[in-house]
């Protein structure tokens, strides 16, 4: 394994799916020194008369042979055109090779003279066997060679083209010999590339041979490399002087011979044995061989070949070459049209001794996790939509998906849209276990792939999973099934609870989103934006900001499977220590347990009372509390962890009014009165956790019988929230023939319910009895919850509007009565004596003045003990904050001081932000980015244009500058300006500033017109660099007291010593 760096990209899988990314070493345990090489293939295939032809490809061939092209005559016979090979003959420079990845694309974009439309289509199929095994190569019958929809494409326009991808069928790929030359004393000797030769044996009984060619034997073989054919005959008497000629022919796909050998034997008047071996070298096999024929004839009387004719074929194979084979047939192409074939092949190559002197090789790097991930993904290629042959537009569209598949850390957005995200996520968790998670992967891959995906996403003829509407699946949220609303780019429905309600309901959305938006089909959508059709006016209800403060608004319910370290896995077989127990009431629900590299689902029953004697000893002390503080034995009471973070102990969102016990179940047998005989087992599973059993707990505490169904879903009040692992839970219910009722995120339930009343209705409908329904079902179980319903109905809309109306800023009018005035006077008198009562009176006045009496009264009826109000006030934002103004609008006019305080705080916050941006910019060398400059620039740091302007000119850019194109400089007129431009920068940069020109002129003056020496040039370049970068290094230079630059005039000669000193002092002054 390569431990030098951490890389989440699976490079080998990425090269397999997108060979254009280049070659990489296969991360298996074959560690030979090798070099990587990418070879291209380009061929122009000309359509013959009739416009039909055949392209045979060997996608997994490790050599330079990729396939062959055949044209078809108008009569329907095939004619061999050319072999398709890589651009370089690999065997001339390399001895061994191993294919990493390959893609071959065929399309047409040219028209012959006189043709004005690009006609013709492709049919393509990848067959797991060999070429000679395909009986019908006709265009219309070719697709029947395989039933796998991911291995064929049909009726693809030649302008679109097809792409053939090399997907390996195994992982133990050996290096193969390429047929390179070996040292020889005479002639040319080559090492045969037939690394794993095939053997064919065929016998024929008595055959009579005449004076014309008689086929004594013929059968199919497959060969692309040197082949040996041995023929054995037992020949009857041949007259002396007569001869027998035996011919061995290798036959191509067209039916014509590829190569042949003949041998003649003379008769001796007796019976004798004849044997010959025909060796066909690489230069003779110019096209794929699909058959061998053995012919015989005599120049005299007919003879009889007694006993048998035996033919043995040896050789002709290279691993990966002969199978699988891809055949692309084209039809109705204009005569003379050019089909462009292009391919990219990535290899691991071992150079020959001469090349090894000049090319560096490296060992392969073993990476078991990367190799395992690649093998698991390829083993599920059908479920993940990985095809061996594509139409080119479809292949290009899937590039982003390929990047997701080959990067184990990328979010599975595209895979999730097609329904493949769960499978890929399970593969990742299994192959790359996260260190800080308590348990490994949870989902059995093969069952999920073969069952859930195929059932939920049927395949079209093209092999692409489709939704029920026939359109490709797209990422979508939880919407009503009655409204065809797809996902919107502006709203993340995966993390936001939302309802889609028919009609326009502006009160249900925030004030800033009450203006409806238009949809493409001419309707209105309120509270959101969408690029899809809605089929009518709709309103998208999201949690309002003020609703987030309600403690009853919990996140989406989800199973959180818990396991203590001492009971991690389900290890004992079901049915151990079982016992049949009769229960008159209860409710069934499924659970999911996680173990080492596997998961399992089981059925449990919730019954009233304490039945710990039926439980496994290790969980008899485990319990969880309900909303009314009753105990549920068999549930966990330990603190559990989610993604490594500790969570509080489990408490069910349901009131049961009694203690309950949950027990594992193997089978259930119902009686006529609604009671049941339950096969209770000890299964050594850990204590149950999660809210998905809350429906069963509510029903078990209310119903007088055991319903014939299993229930799952989280109760929030009387409404049901969706839970996870629906498909796994459905398996537990289906094992004993029960339906799964509830609400799950993956749609695994058989019957979806939205409220507890729906669950009770289903429970009564499932029983063929006269049991009457008690009125308490669905009401006494309610506990601190808020609705979450996948399909909005009129009752939900009314509930929403009633709740919002109850908190509007209005109240019923009050009637002034003398008793009220007297009571208020008594309260005021009491407030003067008791400070606490004074506060209460202030609160009463505030509530009455704000019109909140009815709203708070309704709140008090639901908030027992003020728990929710206390939590809400604890998280309440401070007065005048931005969130408050966004929710409730600006403060009243009379509160001018509050408004000014808010503005002051906002200004201070902006200045603090500008200070942070300014400090970062100055650390990066932008000295001009002061706090005031950042504020004028919109509280933003320097953009690329401003940075470029500053570096090019050394001047402070203007705030708001968005584009800067430096002007080309012109040649300066005087010597100082020319020299300054040369030292300051290249001609395409901004001209040297006047200050730098003065510095250069001063140096010229000091040197009597000569240029600067080395020390002066070093100083000038450093000054130029400082001026251009604008860094603080300029402070390290002490400014010189120089006179202004002027035209150079030579000084008059001074002869006296005093005069020279006088001149120097004048210069330095």
Swiss-Prot record:
Keyword Hydrolase listed: yes
| Short name of one Pfam family | Birna_VP4
Which positions does UniProt annotate for a divalent metal cation binding? 28
Site label Cleavage, positions: 417-418, 460-461, 467-468, 474-475, 486-487, 557-558, 791-792
List, from the UniProt record, the residues annotated as the active site of this protein. Answer: 692, 729
GO CC term, one of those recorded: T=13 icosahedral viral capsid
Q: Which PROSITE patterns match?
A: BIRNAVIRUS_VP4_PRO
GO molecular function terms noted in the UniProt entry: metal ion binding; serine-type peptidase activity; structural molecule activity
- Functional note: Capsid protein VP2 self assembles to form an icosahedral capsid with a T=13 symmetry, about 70 nm in diameter, and consisting of 260 VP2 trimers. The capsid encapsulates the genomic dsRNA. VP2 is also involved in attachment and entry into the host cell. The precursor of VP2 plays an important role in capsid assembly. First, pre-VP2 and VP2 oligomers assemble to form a procapsid. Then, the pre-VP2 intermediates may be processed into VP2 proteins by proteolytic cleavage mediated by VP4 to obtain the mature virion. The final capsid is composed of pentamers and hexamers but VP2 has a natural tendency to assemble into all-pentameric structures. Therefore pre-VP2 may be required to allow formation of the hexameric structures.
Entry EC number(s): 3.4.21.-
Composition skew (Basic and acidic residues), residue ranges: 512-534
User: Which EC class does it fall in?
Assistant: hydrolase
Q: Which residues cross the membrane?
A: none
Q: Provide the Peptidase S50 domain boundaries.
A: 558-791
- Annotated region (Disordered) at 504-534, 876-900, 1031-1069
What's any GO biological process attached to this entry?
A: proteolysis
UniProt KW keywords:
Capsid protein, Host cytoplasm, Hydrolase, Metal-binding, Protease, Serine protease, T=13 icosahedral capsid protein, Virion
Record PTM: Specific enzymatic cleavages yield mature proteins. The capsid assembly seems to be regulated by polyprotein processing. The protease VP4 cleaves itself off the polyprotein, thus releasing pre-VP2 and VP3 within the infected cell. During capsid assembly, the C-terminus of pre-VP2 is further processed by VP4, giving rise to VP2, the external capsid protein and three small peptides that all stay closely associated with the capsid. The N-termini of VP2 and VP3 are blocked.
User: Highest taxon of the source?
Assistant: Viruses
- Quote the protein name from its UniProt record: Structural polyprotein
